[in-house]
C-alpha cells in the first residue's frame, strides 16, 4: 500500500510504502526511489534505459525495522555477522533527508543518520546524472567497516558475466582462500570477498543486452554474492535468477572519522 506524505517539488515526492517512508524521484535524468530506512536506494532507471539498474524483491513487505531485500543496502558500521544485527544498524534505522538540489541535468540528495542525542553519525550522498554515485561518509568516533551492498537487476543468471575481478578470493561458503577466474559466471551459490586490485568491475548481461560498470572509490574489497537456491528472507524461490550482488566495500582498512567510500555506477554500450 502506497500513500503520499508530501510533495517536496514537482519531481520529488515523499510517500509511504506500508511502514516505510520512501522518496520518489521522477526527473529528466531518470527515476529513482530511496527508502528513508537505511537511506537505501531501491530503484534507479536512467533516462533511456529499458530496465531498472537495481533489483528489488517482488515480495518485499516494507516492514519498519526489518532489512529491505534489494536495491543498495548500506552495511555499516560493520559487515557480516561479527556483531548483531548482521551487517550493522544503519540499514534498519531511519535517516533524514538533509539536503537536495535538482538541476536540469543533475540531482543530488543527501541523507543524515543521527544518534539518539542528535549527533550526526554518518551521511549518504546520492548523485544522479547519466551515472549514479553513492557516497557514504563515516562521522562516528570509532573506526568502522562499510559496504554498498548493490543488488543488480539481471535478465537471467545463466546469461551474465562479472568481469575484471581479481583471480583469488576468500570463499565464505568454503571458509578458505581460493583461486578463481577473473571473469566469473554464476552457476551455483557464491559468496566471495576479493581484495580490491582494479577499481572497475563490469557486469555483462546478454539477456538485457547491456553492460554495467561499477567504479569503486576508496574501497579495499569487492564482494560477489548470489544465494542460488538457498533463498533468504523476502525473496521468491527463483529470485536468485534475476539478481547478483557486486558490493563496494571497506573491510580491512577501517573508515576513520570523515572518510568516505563510494560506488559510481553507469551503463555502457553492450559490447557482448
Task: Tell me what each language-model feature is.
Residues 143, 151-222, 227:
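Active-site/ligand-binding surface loops and adjacent short beta/alpha elements
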Amino acid at each position: 500500500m502506497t500513500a503520499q506524505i508530501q510533495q517536496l517539488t514537482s519531481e520529488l515526492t515523499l510517500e509511504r510504502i506500508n511502514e516505510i517512508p520512501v522518496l520518489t524521484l521522477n526527473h529528466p535524468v531518470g527515476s529513482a526511489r530511496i527508502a528513508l530506512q537505511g537511506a537505501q536506494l531501491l530503484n534507479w532507471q536512467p533516462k533511456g534505459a529499458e530496465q531498472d539498474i537495481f533489483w528489488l524483491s517482488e515480495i518485499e513487505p516494507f516492514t519498519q525495522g526489518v532489512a529491505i531485500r534489494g536495491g543498495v543496502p548500506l552495511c555499516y558500521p560493520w559487515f557480516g555477522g561479527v556483531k548483531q544485527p548482521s551487517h550493522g544498524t544503519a540499514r534498519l534505522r531511519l535517516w533524514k533527508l538533509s539536503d537536495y538540489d535538482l538541476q536540469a541535468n543533475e540531482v543530488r540528495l543527501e541523507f543524515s543518520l543521527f544518534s539518539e542525542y542528535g549527533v550526526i553519525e554518518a551521511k549518504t550522498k546520492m548523485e544522479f546524472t547519466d551515472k549514479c554515485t553513492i557516497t557514504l561518509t563515516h562521522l562516528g568516533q570509532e573506526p568502522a567497516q562499510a559496504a554498498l551492498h548493490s543488488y543488480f537487476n539481471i535478465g537471467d543468471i545463466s546469461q551474465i558475466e562479472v568481469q575484471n575481478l581479481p583471480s583469488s578470493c576468500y570463499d565464505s561458503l568454503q571458509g578458505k582462500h581460493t583461486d578463481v577466474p577473473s571473469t566469473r559466471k554464476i552457476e551455483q551459490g557464491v559468496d566471495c570477498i576479493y581484495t580490491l586490485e582494479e577499481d572497475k568491475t563490469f557486469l555483462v548481461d546478454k539477456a538485457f543486452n547491456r553492460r554495467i560498470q561499477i567504479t569503486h572509490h576508496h574501497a579495499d574489497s569487492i564482494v560477489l554474492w548470489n544465494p542460488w537456491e538457498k533463498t533468504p528472507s523476502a525473496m521468491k524461490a527463483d529470485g536468485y535468477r534475476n539478481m547478483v550482488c557486486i558490493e563496494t566495500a571497506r573491510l580491512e582498512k577501517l573508515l576513520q572519522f570523515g572518510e568516505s567510500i563510494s560506488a559510481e555506477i553507469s551503463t555502457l554500450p553492450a559490447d557482448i
